[in-house]
Amino acid sequence: LCDENTKILHRNTEDSKMDVSVIGTVYPFELLSPNEKKVVNTVEKINLTLRTYTSGYLRFEQDSYMGGNSPWPIATLWMALYYIKSGNRKKALECFEFVTKSATKLGFLSEQVDNKTMKPNWVIGLGWSHAMYIITLAEILKK
């Protein structure tokens, strides 16, 4: 769903808040090319609205789950996969390193990361975050 005026992808026609899940149009679904203008515009907007000062990414604008404003490893890995597909290895590694540094001593990933401490926050040991981490690592190693 692309806004014809801004050329930015949105999660639906009723809501113009940015949502990192629209990157799914590039990966894994490959409906759009990572370098299409509407995708590039969307990524620029995601970086303005969802990227935190610690380099992690929020899920969507005004996300209030558990207080909001905490980056999600899964969202950050999704951005890493976008950057891999777009050929920006440096940014992909930056996202991947953020997630790696936020893991517990045993390597478990959390649902969110505390921006102040960079420690795992909330639920720890999520299958989807670990699966996305492995997928991202495999993609990094391919390049």
Give residue spans per PLM region.
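Internal helical hairpin/lid segments
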Residues: 67-87
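Extended glycan-interaction surfaces of carbohydrate-active proteins
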Residues: 1-72, 94-143
